[in-house]
Amino acid sequence: MSSGTPYIGSKISLISKAQIRYEGILYTIDTENSTVALAKVRSFGTEDRPTDRPAPPREEVYEYIIFRGSDIKDITVCEPPKASHALSQDPAIVQSSLGSAASYQPSVPYSPFRGMPTYSQLAATSLLSQQYAASLGLAGFPSIPVRKSPMVEQAVQTGPLENQAQKKVQQAKGAPVGLRGVRQSGPQSQPAPLNVPPPAAPVLGTVNDENRRPPRRRSGNRRTRNRSRGQNRPTTVKENAIKFEGDFDFESANAQFNREELDKEFKDKLNFKDDKPEKAGEEKTDSGVETQNSDGNPEEDPLGPNTYYDRSKSFFDNISSEMKSRRTTWAEERKLNTETFGVSGRFLRGRSFRGGFRGGRGSAAPRRNQTTQRAGTGRV
């Protein structure tokens, strides 16, 4: 080095074994780990020095870089530390810093590199010994991984100095209220943690949920009103509905019926005998007297075959007539109608009476009957 004593806060020009020159403010020298820390560092590249890997200069300014002592080739003091108005020699004072030099500091928002003090604070601590710096934690830096280099251990990259002022102004405008008044009271590498308020996204989410709740309540009220109107409606459930795939084919259906077989079947049921017709008084096959049960079997004649009228057995007589011989029973007529016209449709109940008296949508017939009954009893 050009001088025998290192100056904390002075501007240092450092050349590494890779022939790359760095300029920055001397921050601290760690004798135990053999490292040198520079603040506000800028790389000027190899600058025509002989090397296998030439590097161009860079415009980025790093907050600090810790260099390994074994990889440093040369160190030169460019500028001595700036003079600061030190206090009187008082053994009670351990460390001090000027607030006027850091006037821009209150507007700076929270930064992950807040542990690195400013240049003015470095100048104020130029007379501190290495023991005081170690006891106050000045030699500790947050471990931030950067690109590998044989002489650079840690580095913090920031933007160019021209863009930093604009970014600070923009961040100061958009910074939270609780963070605008934060300022650093000394070069401490590990300051007290800040009580940062939680992000406003969950709060906005809860506000949106509260704004959405009234429409849900309205929808619930609408449902209750609809239920009160139609709660007495009879539910019509269709059981075993018959599905027709196509139109009915009358020709194929008529082809299945044989007229002669049907006539023969009806004659057998009615006990008609074409060959030997019975007498008028002995006609046993009177369909009017003979009735069929639900199974279609003819019941026995309550009167005798030769008894025309018996008062004790039946009110009806057994006198044959042309109308009685042609008349069929209800079971046969129902079967004949089913074969001719098909299955009749089901009667759906409850269609004309909707809602009853509570819903107010019922038919007018029950109300008319109610008014007539009240008029008859004399009630109003």
Curated annotation (Swiss-Prot):
Every Sm domain range: 1-81
Region Disordered, residue ranges: 160-241, 268-312, 352-380
Signal peptide boundaries: none
Motif extent (TFG box): 325-345
DFDF domain segment(s): 236-272
Gene Ontology cellular-component terms listed: ribonucleoprotein complex
Keywords per UniProt: Developmental protein, Ribonucleoprotein, Translation regulation
Motif FFD box, residue range(s) on this chain: 307-323
Name under which the protein is recorded: Protein LSM14 homolog B-B
Phylogenetic classification of the source organism: Eukaryota, Metazoa, Chordata, Craniata, Vertebrata
Annotated gene: lsm14b-b
